[in-house]
Amino acid sequence: ILAHSKNGKGEASRRIHRWARRYGLRGGESERPTLLNSWEGVYFTFTEKVLHGMMKRAADLGIELFVLDDGWVGGRFPRNDARAGLGDWQVNRAKLPHGLEGLIRQAEKLGIRFGIWVEPEMVNPHSELYQNHPEWVIGLPHRENRLERSQYLLDLSNPHVCRYILDAMRKLLGGHPGISYVKWDCNRKISDPGSPWLDACRQGNLPIDYVRGYERILETLAAEFPDVIFQACSSGGGRADYGTMWKHHEFWTSDNTDAYERVFMQWGIGHLFPAISMAAHVTASPNHQTGRSASLKFRFDVAMSGRLGFE
């Protein structure tokens, strides 16, 4: 990407923004809904009743979309913390006895939209998927695979893995047409770069084949669910690049939601990315990451310089 300007950095930045909105982002010239994301409000510890209350208060404030973050996955390994459940993508009926369908109905009743968090590229050791397919995980032979955030990385160079992820997301979105927003998370890097799928002479292809598998999944989902907004989240802005963003509408700028620190992040990112691409949320004071207190007006001012949301 090259921008030319005779009038300094500001004009070059605005030219990149115009290009990005037209060509570099999905839906770059469409309006974004304001949203309430559940994460910092409840983390993993929520019930259906608690979520209904959050949705009601969001609707009363005029917020247009409610996003259920991590903690909704169930099955044999319910996800009540970060150590279990990733990869299984079944609803935790102990927390949500009426399933996602019940939450979607409640959102529709309140006149707001519904979104969901997923992390399809990851798997916990405590999951049905890992127990059935340990060979689907990226790792080096004859070495203990290293956990990060209690999870392993699935091998997207393997077409069977990509097919599993695609089928799981099709089931989630196709079975719940009321889902209008997906927060696609990715909370760890490749730390043990070996593929059980690739031949020895092709091990160096892993990073490229991984990205190609990821792109094929997102391209397919975008074609099959064109009205669903996709956010790229990677422990914050780990995927804030134009190679990724033409498959996503926006990115989560940082897991650090301190408004003061976000000023500098958003200023820097704003040189290359338009405001519509940066998710920025009003969060609690004191802030959960830094402990810093800030006025509600200041937190709003900072969040409104991106795509406005709330936690």
List each language-model region with its residue ranges:
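Active-site neighborhood of glycoside hydrolase catalytic domains
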Residues: N92-G99, Q106-K109, Q131-K297, S305-F310
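Short, flexible, glycine/charge-rich loop motifs used to bind or transfer phosphoryl groups or to couple energy/partner
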Residues: G24-L25, K56, L172, L221
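Flexible loop/turn segments at secondary-structure boundaries
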Residues: N7, V42-F46, W72-R79, E121-S127, ...
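An acidic, glycine-/histidine-flanked metal-binding catalytic module
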Residues: S13
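Active-site His/acidic residue clusters
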Residues: N80-L86, P196-L198, A303
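Long, charged amphipathic helices and adjacent flexible linkers at domain junctions
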Residues: I16-E29, T34
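Short Pro-Gly-centered flexible turn/kink motifs
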Residues: I1-N7
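Aromatic-lined carbohydrate-binding/catalytic grooves of carbohydrate-active enzymes
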Residues: E29-D167, H176, Y181
